[in-house]
């Protein structure tokens, strides 16, 4: 499988991790569409772009039109300042598209790749010593880009300027990407693709399942999206917009959603052909 890694050259976390990955893989400098720096290692293209990561809407064509999926390396920002290594899919479950993408549009998820990245981040953080101070977690689906037709998964380092410029953080992301690419084929063969509903932004129950169960989780639609008017169509797309096929299970955090909200998920899941499992 051909994969691509993209980052913003204006983002110290993404740029640092992307260049660390190129060094780790002994990637050769090359040129690729739209990028200001580009490296090639076998079937993997690693490229930096002069735009924000949340606005990389050109990923179908760049950096590798033949890539099946794209991993975006990026900084993570949180007002709490919590040190974290996160994985999530892009998409705007509600009308709010202030951070790129189209309103009420989800990108294509890749549950197996997200699982491979999260497991690999946990492993890499232990190897680099960051596990003691950094939390490895999924995030709910949020921000752009939303228009690429190929799947996009974000792997992020946060949450302060100090963290974004931490070389150990860059190394951790780079090691995780290398490991995820190696383990992806087996994970994809064995895992059950799912979508998540409910929970907070950091979806702790879904994170635990991603790390420890046979499920691989793509889009996660948090409780606050329901409170802000998520539509039935978006809920259905959280299941359907998944590579290589729709999610087979909707994992619903029961206590975090009100009864009408749970019914919305049940109806959307039935229409999309997914089984509902409460967690």
From Swiss-Prot:
Monomer. It comes from Aeropyrum pernix (strain ATCC 700893 / DSM 11879 / JCM 9820 / NBRC 100138 / K1). D-aminoacyl-tRNA deacylase with broad substrate specificity. By recycling D-aminoacyl-tRNA to D-amino acids and free tRNA molecules, this enzyme counteracts the toxicity associated with the formation of D-aminoacyl-tRNA entities in vivo. HAMAP family: Deacylase_DtdA. The lineage of its organism: Archaea, Thermoproteota, Thermoprotei, Desulfurococcales, Desulfurococcaceae. This is D-aminoacyl-tRNA deacylase. SUPFAM superfamilies: AF0625-like. Binds 2 Zn(2+) ions per subunit. Its EC number is 3.1.1.96. It comes from the Archaea.
């Amino acid at each position: 499988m051909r994969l691509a890694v993209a980052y913003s050259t204006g983002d110290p976390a993404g740029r640092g991790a992307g260049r660390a990955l190129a060094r780790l893989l002994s990637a050769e400098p090359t040129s690729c569409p739209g990028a200001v720096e580009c490296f090639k290692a076998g079937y993997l293209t690693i490229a930096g772009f002069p735009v924000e990561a949340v606005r990389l809407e050109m990923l179908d064509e760049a950096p590798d039109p033949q890539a099946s999926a794209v991993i975006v390396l990026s900084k993570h920002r949180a007002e709490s300042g919590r040190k974290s290594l996160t994985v999530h899919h892009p998409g705007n479950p509600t009308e709010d598209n202030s951070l790129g993408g189209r309103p009420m549009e989800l990108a294509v998820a890749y549950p197996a790749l997200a699982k491979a990245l999260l497991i690999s981040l946990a492993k890499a953080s232990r190897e680099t010593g960051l596990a003691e101070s950094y939390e490895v977690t999924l995030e709910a689906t949020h921000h752009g880009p939303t228009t690429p037709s190929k799947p996009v998964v974000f792997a992020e380092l946060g949450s302060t300027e100090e963290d974004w410029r931490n070389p150990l953080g860059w190394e951790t992301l780079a090691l995780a990407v290398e490991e995820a690419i190696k383990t992806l084929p087996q994970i994809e063969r064995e895992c059950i693709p799912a979508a998540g509903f409910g929970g907070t932004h950091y979806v702790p129950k879904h994170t635990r399942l991603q790390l420890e169960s046979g499920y691989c989780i793509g889009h996660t639609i948090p409780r606050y999206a329901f409170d802000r008017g998520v539509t039935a169509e978006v809920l259905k797309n959280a299941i359907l917009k998944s590579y290589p096929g729709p999610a087979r299970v909707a994992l619903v955090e029961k206590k975090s959603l009100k009864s009408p909200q749970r019914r919305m998920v049940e109806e959307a899941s039935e229409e999309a052909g997914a089984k509902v499992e409460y967690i």
